Amino acid sequence: MSVLGALEPARVMHYFEEICGIPHGSGNTKKISDYCVSFAKEHHLTYLQDEYNNVIIWKDGIKGYENSAPVMLQGHLDMVCEKEEGCDIDFETDGLCLQVEDGIVTAEKTTLGGDDGIAVAYALALLETDEYPHPPLEIVLTVDEEIGMLGATALDTSPLRAKTMLNLDSEDEGHLLVSCAGGVTAQVELPLSFETGDGEKYAVSYTHLTLPTIA
C-alpha cells in the first residue's frame, strides 16, 4: 500500500516512493541505476548507462519545440545513509520505511534521501508525460555525489549537447542559484607527534550557581 499516494504532485511522489524502496547509498547504486534504465526502456527513451552506474536519458522536444536548444536536468542517484541507534535496517539490502506526519515526509529512524532522490523523481515524472511543453531533454543522473562527486568526475560528457543545465540539488525550496563555483574534495595528511608537557594541571568546578532574577 502506498504511503505517499495522497500527496502532490502525485507522479513525483509515486516515483520518490519507488526510489526510497531501492537501496541506493553511496557506493551501492547498481540497483537504482538499473531501475532508471528499466524506466527508459519501458517508455521507449534513448539512454546510456556507463560502467560507473551513471545514467543519461534523452527525450525529444514535444511538438513545436523539436528544434529548440536542449536542456539538461541533473541530479544524483546516491543518498547519505544514517540511522538511529537500534534501527535494524540494512542500507545495503533494505529500502526505507516512509511516514507522513502533517504533510511532512520522513523515514522512520533513518535518513530520507530527499537529497537527491526528489530530483530523480521529478525527472522521471517529467519524462513519462507530454503534458508540459519542453525542448529536447537530457536527464543526467550521476552516482556517488555524496562522497566526492565521483560519478560526475568519471562521466563521459561527449554525448551531451545541452548548453543549459538545471541542477536539481539546491538547499532552499523556491530559490534558484545562478552559476556556482563547483565543489572540491581534498584529503590532507599532516605529521602529528605528541610531547609530554611540564607544569601543573588544575581542575575547576562551579557549584550552587544562582541565576539573577529579572523583574
Residue ranges and their predicted role:
Residues 79, 170-172, 213:
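Short, glycine/acidic-enriched loop or turn micro-motifs at the edges of active sites
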Residues 207-213:
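Conserved small/polar residues in nucleotide/adenosyl-binding loops
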Residues 136-206:
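Fold-level recognition of mixed alpha/beta catalytic cores in primary-metabolism enzymes, strongest
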